[in-house]
Amino acid sequence: MARVKKKVLLIEPNYANKFPPIGLMKIATYYRNRGELYGDGWEVVFYKGDLKRFVIERITDKLIEKLNDADGTNRDWHFHKDILFEYVRTRRTELLDSLPVTIPAVSDGEKPVKNIALLDLVNEAKDKYWKKTWEQEPEWDRVGVTTLFTFYWDITIETIEFAKRLVKDPKDLMVGGVLASIQPRELSEVTGLHIHKKGQAGGIHIGILRAGDLDKGDEQKIDELELD
């Protein structure tokens, strides 16, 4: 049986900058390499933007998988992703009229009926977002947040606090970068995160990442890795 991949989410706060997050790109390479080097491959996802939209996107993607499995036709629900996303985001019931959830009449005189099973899946996804039950089922084994300059303090803190809701265990939330290296103790006081200890991925990382910083015994020199 194939081993289930762990998942790591790498986040750049929605900074107004155009430079690529080099640190996160090297960390992405690190995690992708672990599959070949140590046999524990990771699924790596990078995100920059509105994290609420990210949550809705993930809920919608899982909804599409369920709809494709439950629908008895050859329909591909990916073609309806935009409408599904908007319904989960807004709860506007008129959007349901644009979805193919009607079972055609099989004989003259019969009226088409709604496919309740499909509608239930759609509404479960909507409720998962609005009732915040997604917070009870975090998807990510590790989450990393990069930081820039101190004048981005507010958005950095907001991102870290949101990231706590995405990771399965808060001790596996990694924060690094410029601000984390300049003001680690101030960041620790505000967020409650500990200063990083070698061999434990989570915490506030100061300076560059070295071999063994994220996983004990891993000999990859992270700062020297190629960009993903």
Sequence positions of predicted segments:
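A short, structured N-terminal alpha-helical element that caps or precedes a catalytic domain
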Residues: 1-190
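N-terminal [4Fe-4S]-dependent radical SAM core
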Residues: 2-8, 189-228
